[in-house]
Amino acid sequence: MRERVKTAYGDRVSDTPDPIAEAHRQWSSRWPEHADHMAAVTSVMRAQQLLLSRIEAVLKPYGLTFAAYEALRLLAFTRTGTLPMGKMGTRLMVHPASVTNVIGRLERRGLVGRGPSPDDRRVVLATITPAGRDIAEDATLALNRSGFGIADLPAAEAAEITAALRSVRVSAGDLP
């Protein structure tokens, strides 16, 4: 039977109860002072799973993961199409080994090139190729059409989510 479930996270119609709301209820009976924090983190983690799945479905026809798309898009945004791989890691907020792996996969597909910096041989540069630019543009159009997985959310709500998560990032030390 479908029922309207009222939770602290809004009303929804469901055949089954919201597992996070149920976890919140259970947590509240044992650790009430932590229940809201647990539910917030669990909700963010679940939303991340759902959105990554939607985004990767959009990117699949292009043979890209979201990490690979982000790397291509970052390179495409630069004036020269080239960045030091260390700087890419900083801008993408990932470990340098992750950048190396992603760039390696993109390089094997001919979407980026990799080589030493002419100014400092210790620095490895990644450069987007014309084929990489084409795929980055096509994938960006597809993601824009999909609303990045949240097309059904009003823009104002998306902005509210961004603002709320910014405070989480500040609290976690990700931003000043």
Language-model regions: role of each:
Residues 35, 45, 49, 53-95:
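N-terminal helix-turn-helix DNA-binding core of bacterial DNA-binding proteins
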Residues 66, 80-125:
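Canonical helix-turn-helix DNA-binding module
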Residues 73, 101, 163:
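DNA-binding alpha-helical recognition surfaces that contact promoter or target DNA
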Residues 104-159, 163:
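Charged, amphipathic alpha-helical coiled-coil/dimerization segments
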